[in-house]
């Protein structure tokens, strides 16, 4: 979360032109209105980095930062949005939009990728039709997977707050030698995750958290009822006494039932 009092003090000290809100792990809603109030006090703009939350916002399971007071929002068009690699800058401020338009092309960019633009158009068509259902399932599976892991003795960050309200959560990685070490063990078992820093005691030589997200597994068709089995695989992959390759063979076989791409719409020929 954000320490609003500390932010106000710092903002008045350095008088920034812009205050950026966002991060690589977003578990709970950000106090955008409070940040905007501070920005107004010092004449700053507010930029919300929605790189990881783009799908949550598009699916209306996360507050819309531009409505809450952000002047600008940047986001990836892949990650939780599930589109082609790239990003967008959006605003509901006409003056800012005109300035962005004046410098973006030609200027900061010399051309655009027509194929990527077409792919993004298809992605956004999907979101208009089934985006809310996709986003809701990402959150539900994230919460269910976190709970199932906690039940198996794999401690989750922010357990006292319900783990998460997004598609992401974090495992406390110290018992596994750190987040990157844990991620490598999971990779040996055919499971992908990554280390991440958490605002808790450090792990020397490694990260103290292990980040897990659900956009890909939901797109493949996994639902809440599949999270118990997935938690079992993850818990065993993190157990140093368990053979990772034996877990991988089970994961590979289990994964075969999820072969389609879900939350899409058929476009006319």
Predicted segments, located by residue:
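Conserved alpha/beta core surface patches that mediate binding of polyanionic ligands
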Residues: 103-106, 190-197
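PLP-dependent enzyme catalytic core of the Aspartate aminotransferase-like
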Residues: 140, 204-269
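Conserved small-domain helix->loop->beta segment predominantly found in fold-type I
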Residues: 124, 135, 139-183, 194-208, ...
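Generic non-transmembrane alpha-helical segments
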Residues: 8, 38, 144, 148-152, ...
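Intrinsically disordered or highly flexible coil/loop and linker segments, enriched in small
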Residues: 109, 113, 133, 151-155, ...
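Conserved PLP-enzyme active-site core in the AAT-like
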Residues: 1-155, 214
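Active-site lining segments that contact anionic ligands and/or coordinate catalytic metals
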Residues: 70, 84-86, 164-168, 183, ...
């Amino acid at each position: 979360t954000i320490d609003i009092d500390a932010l106000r003090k710092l903002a008045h000290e350095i008088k920034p032109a812009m205050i950026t809100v966002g991060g690589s792990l977003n578990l709970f809603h950000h106090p955008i209105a409070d940040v905007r109030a501070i920005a107004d006090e010092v004449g700053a703009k507010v930029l919300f980095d929605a790189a990881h939350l783009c799908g949550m916002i598009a699916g209306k399971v996360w507050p819309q930062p531009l409505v809450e007071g952000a002047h600008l929002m940047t986001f990836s068009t892949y990650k939780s949005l599930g589109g082609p690699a790239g990003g967008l800058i959006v605003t509901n401020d006409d003056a800012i939009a005109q300035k962005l338009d004046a410098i973006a092309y030609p200027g900061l960019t010399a051309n655009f990728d027509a194929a990527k633009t077409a792919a993004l158009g298809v992605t956004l068509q999907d979101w208009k039709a089934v985006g809310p259902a996709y986003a809701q399932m990402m959150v539900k599976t994230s919460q269910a997977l976190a709970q199932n892991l906690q039940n198996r003795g794999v401690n989750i960050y922010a357990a006292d707050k319900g783990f998460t309200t997004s598609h992401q959560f974090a495992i406390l990685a110290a018992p596994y030698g750190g987040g990157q070490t844990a991620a490598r063990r999971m990779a040996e078992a055919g499971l992908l995750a990554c280390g991440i820093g958490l605002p808790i005691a450090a792990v020397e030589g490694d990260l103290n958290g292990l980040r897990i997200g659900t956009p890909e597994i939901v797109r493949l068709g996994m639902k809440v009822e599949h999270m118990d089995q997935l938690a079992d695989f993850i818990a065993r992959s993190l157990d140093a006494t368990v053979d990772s390759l034996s877990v991988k063979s089970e994961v590979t076989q289990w994964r075969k039932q999820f072969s389609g791409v879900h939350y899409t719409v058929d476009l006319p020929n």
